[in-house]
Amino acid sequence: MTREITVGGVKIGGGRPLALVAGPCVIENETATLRCAERLMSICNGVGISLIFKASYDKANRTSVTAFRGPGMKEGLRILAKVKEALGVPVLSDIHSIEQVEPAADVLDVLQIPAFLCRQTDLLVAAANTGKVINVKKGQFLAPWDMKNVVGKISSCGNENIILTERGASFGYNNLVVDMRSFPIMRSTGYPVIFDATHSVQLPGGEGTSSGGQREYVEFLSRAAVAAGVDGIFMEVHEEPEQALCDGPNSVRLDDMPALLKKLKSIDAIVNQ
């Protein structure tokens, strides 16, 4: 059993039902972001699953220098604050530097540490010192048991509000693979584990100047992860993935979410009997 973490009105871990972290890869504009959040809230309320809304204000590690990165921190946080106020949903976004920690913590319910930055001690400590919930994505280059050291850096600051996310491991060039053993190994730290089902099917840099993806495998890996006992699922979604400004090839179409979430909820209920 993992520790129960409270994010706004959402509880993750501790034997609680499966939670969902979902939203667009990047904030494209205010209207689209609010529309996506409203749609997700409606879907989750209909299925009966708790939602934490996610969206990045800056995609700092895009493949190409010309790729769309987002509106930036100030405008992005303003939009996320509006989503939070309008819908009453907890919000999550990535932080990339120590300078971003304080302003982000003023708005966000969850500070997310990107996978490429998961070993950056100063960033982890600065985030931990806010007292906020910290979601750390396991680096594609890390073994699952190495996350205990990441946990130690955060908990050494007195912050036990920790969530860990599996997002696949590098498998040769331009590919990722998911080792299902990582879920019980990471949960053995005592903290909830989330599966990032959409980044795990990403093909990093696979399109030359952008990343590819195989969204057709999202459902299969999600079902397997829930059966393996994860505490939550992370998915990037879009109304029209083909038109998305970031990570369209591995984003789930919003229209497909109700049926998928119903399946995942049913599997979770069996696992937690």
Swiss-Prot record:
Keywords: Cytoplasm, Lipopolysaccharide biosynthesis, Transferase. Its EC number is 2.5.1.55. It is found in: Cytoplasm. InterPro entries: Aldolase_TIM (IPR013785), DAHP1/KDSA (IPR006218), KDO8P_synthase (IPR006269). One of its GO terms (molecular function) is 3-deoxy-8-phosphooctulonate synthase activity. Gene3D superfamilies: Aldolase class I. Its main location: cytoplasm. It comes from the Bacteria. One of its GO terms (cellular component) is cytoplasm. It catalyses: D-arabinose 5-phosphate + phosphoenolpyruvate + H2O = 3-deoxy-alpha-D-manno-2-octulosonate-8-phosphate + phosphate. Pathway: Carbohydrate biosynthesis; 3-deoxy-D-manno-octulosonate biosynthesis; 3-deoxy-D-manno-octulosonate from D-ribulose 5-phosphate: step 2/3; Bacterial outer membrane biogenesis; lipopolysaccharide biosynthesis. The keyword Cytoplasm applies. The keyword Cytoplasm applies. GO terms for biological process: keto-3-deoxy-D-manno-octulosonic acid biosynthetic process. It is an enzyme of class 2 (transferase). Pfam families: DAHP_synth_1. HAMAP family: KDO8P_synth (MF_00056). Belongs to the KdsA family. This is 2-dehydro-3-deoxyphosphooctonate aldolase. It comes from Geobacter sp. (strain M21). The lineage of its organism: Bacteria, Pseudomonadati, Thermodesulfobacteriota, Desulfuromonadia, Geobacterales. The gene is kdsA.
